[in-house]
Amino acid sequence: MQTIPLRATANQTLQVVLDGQDCSLRIYTRTLSDGGDTLFCDLDIAQRPVFYGAICLDGLPLPLYPWLGMSGRLVFVDMQGTAAPHWSGLGSRWRLVYLSPAEAEAYAEGRRL
């Protein structure tokens, strides 16, 4: 498991190598019709799109499907509960972690990491 450093800003782009994959992540906030801020994520690996516009939720692995071209999964983790991440708490309350393929499989099966 690898923690990806995030800043408490509404929009950010970062480059990180995850399990040998050159990843470009874009985390951004959109205000939805209910007036609440919602985080979304885009991911490119080696300058090739893997997914765009994925909603960021606590505990939801990204990408949702293994055939999208990423080895392993990204997961937002709420360190204080189970709320959807908000930009103001990124890097502290909400952390983004990378799970290797074996860790992602264990996570999907509900096993402790």
Language model region names:
Residues M1-R26:
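Short, charged/polar N-terminal "headpieces" of proteins
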Residues M1-I4, Y28-T29, P61-P63, A83:
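Intrinsically disordered, low-complexity segments enriched in polar/charged residues with Gly/Pro
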Residues H86-L113:
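C-terminal charged interaction modules
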Residues R7, D19, Y28-R30, D44, ...:
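Structured beta-strand/turn binding interfaces of compact recognition modules in eukaryotic regulators
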Residues A8-A10, D22, G59, Q80, ...:
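Solvent-exposed, flexible loop/coil residues
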Residues T31-Q80:
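Acidic, aromatic-enriched beta-alpha/helix-loop junctions
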Residues L18-D37, W87:
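Short, surface-exposed loop and linker segments with low hydrophobicity and enrichment for Pro/Ser/Thr
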Residues Q12, L39, W94:
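Short beta-strand/loop motifs in extracellular/secreted proteins, especially
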